[in-house]
Amino acid sequence: AQCEATVESNDAMQYNVKEIVVDKSCKQFTMHLKHVGKMAKVAMGHNLVLTKDADKQAVATDGMGAGLAQDYVKAGDTRVIAHTKVIGGGESDSVTFDVSKIAAGENYAYFCSFPGHWAMMKGTLKLGS
């Protein structure tokens, strides 16, 4: 099974992957984020935050208040299944989570919680059959 996925982000606030299906035989799953743009993280930083789809907007809103030093993720937010750090152009980061944290039939979303990005920079994640 392919127990990882790579998502590229750019200076135009886009992810190149809109859907990730996690093979249910995977015990752990790794999400790799690459910033293929040129801009610095203070201006055009991106991260990858995984939550239930229903929690996406609230987590993004709370994350804005956390600031760049906290990677725009509220400390101790139990709605966050996994997240990368905020990266700038030419950088990359990865995060691994236990597949037991996601359930079949539930809709999950991954998004960038950098202020103003989440509405455009998002995708769906689900457990495969």
From Swiss-Prot:
Primary location class: periplasm
Keyword ATP-binding belongs to the record: no
GO molecular function: copper ion binding; electron transfer activity
Gene3D superfamilies membership: Cupredoxins - blue copper proteins
Disulfides per UniProt: C3-C26
Compartmental location: Periplasm
Residues reported to bind Cu cation: H46, C112, H117, M121
Keywords: Copper, Disulfide bond, Electron transport, Metal-binding, Periplasm, Transport
Location of the Plastocyanin-like domain: 1-129
Entry-linked Pfam families: Copper-bind
InterPro entries in UniProt: Azurin (IPR014068), BlueCu_1 (IPR000923), BlueCu_1_BS (IPR028871), Cu-binding_ET (IPR050845), Cupredoxin (IPR008972)
GO cellular component terms, A-Z: periplasmic space
Known function: Transfers electrons from cytochrome c551 to cytochrome oxidase.
Protein name as catalogued: Azurin-2
High-level lineage: Bacteria, Pseudomonadati, Pseudomonadota, Betaproteobacteria, Burkholderiales
